[in-house]
Amino acid sequence: MDNNMKYYEAYEERYKTVHQKGISWASDKSTPIVMDIIRRYYIKPEYELLEIGCGEGRDSKAVLDEGYHLTATDISAEAISYSQKHMPEYAQHFRVLDCLSCDLDSSFDYIYAVAVLHMLVPEEDRNGFYHFIHDHLKSEGIALICTMGDGKTEIQSDISKAFELQERDHPFASALTSSVTIPMTSLLIHGFMTDASIG
């Protein structure tokens, strides 16, 4: 393990570990709200879409199968390689990206991130995530940030233990390590308008 790796890069090792066992990290069932938002806001196939934290591509596949122009990104090279191998017809749509330290030359009509924000623990990293989305979203664009939590309880992971692999018992080899509540005010502070009717 590289001592210079950031805590949120621990998923690289987790993906490698489960893939070496011939299993996937998550189920292949897509997150319904991703396509629900596309339909609700009349996002057209020719629009530019960005997925942050695509993992093994479960949501990417659903979007790409519908003919949308999607760039699917993840910080994990292992996850991107897995997605390209399992969806060779869409391989060119997947790329490695650390949205906290890299930039893209494009802007997007729809940016979505499912189960990403809870992995960014310090406030400065969450702020960097919001800034990346704000900087890459077209002026009339739509952003979907879908995270874990019950809306009341906030649990903060110990980032010093991010690289400690833990034995987990779960049906799809998919367990996420922390759960957070995102106050709407933090989205408003970063220049986002919110739609509280989604749910």
Where are these regions (language model features)?
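A conserved beta-strand element that flanks and buttresses the S-adenosyl-L-methionine
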Residues: 112
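Class I (Rossmann-like) S-adenosyl-L-methionine-dependent methyltransferase catalytic domain
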Residues: 1-45, 49-103, 142-199
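A short glycine-rich, Lys/Arg-flanked "PGG" loop and its adjoining helix->strand segment in the class I
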Residues: 127-139
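Conserved catalytic-core motifs of eukaryotic protein kinase domains, centered on the activation segment
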Residues: 122-124
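Short catalytic micro-motifs in class I SAM-dependent methyltransferases
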Residues: 115-119
